[in-house]
């Protein structure tokens, strides 16, 4: 009887972990597609609108943590997309390059939950001037769509360097 119970629990855990890995891989592919779309948007001068709303839930929130805001700053979906479009209108671009993707875990159970963690390097450009930076993100999903992104980067350093080019 003990062997049967052990086998049952082992099989249950295996299939549970396998499902979580499938959710992670699906979410990761969706996120990689989003990054590709953002990079193309900034490279292609014929694109005026960033068609990425379908990647996010309606109540998506981007959380950032600039200096002096230890609780962070919340940016809504519409403001997040508008900010990227405004960057392009100001003749700025961003290219997200080197990326390391890892599976995320549930904060309470510490088990895979389909979320994605990302360490990345990016370049923000104004004309021919470039600012390189690194950042870390945690990306949560609901039914295959991004519900929240938490990002940590040196916003002050990036802003300071960008301001030198904008004078």
Named regions from a protein language model:
Residues 4-15:
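Sec-dependent N-terminal signal peptides
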Residues 17-50, 54:
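Short, low-complexity N-terminal intrinsically disordered segments enriched in polar/charged residues
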Residues 50-114:
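A solvent-exposed, acidic/Ser-Thr-rich amphipathic alpha-helical stretch
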Residues 52-57, 139-147:
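Short, solvent-exposed coil/turn segments at beta-strand boundaries
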Residues 69, 123-132:
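Short, cysteine-centered beta-strand-loop-beta hairpins and adjacent loop/turn segments enriched
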Residues 112-122:
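A short hydrophobic beta-strand element
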